[in-house]
Amino acid sequence: MAKAKKLKQLSFTMPNRAGLLSEVTAGVLGAKVNINTLCAYELENNAYFMLTVDSNAKAKKALAKLGIETKEEDVVAVEMSNRVGELEKVSKKIADAGININYIYGTTGTGKSSICVFKTSDNTKAIILINK
């Protein structure tokens, strides 16, 4: 069964350039912060980052030293079985309630679970529905 919880995600945008991901991850590493999930992409020469970490305060401070201004956003983290159809079950619960999914990113591995991060039009309601 999927388990959902509210998280505070850090996000920021910067002009894209070679080596930016390495700089960001080195800065976070220097603060001894673990990155739990990460989505990064380029659009129109800008780099967009969304990440969840084990210490937002430490990560924000480390990134500020690099001149990066971050913002915190509420997101839904969902841990689910790494099996065929699990994401469909979760997304159907959200859709059936009329909740819009603004974006999703996730990770799977060879283990028994995967994690997806959602931003929805009603995170609180989505968490309740997923945890039923």
Question: What is each model feature region?
Answer:
Residues M1-K132:
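A conserved regulatory-domain signal marking ACT and ACT-like small-molecule sensing domains
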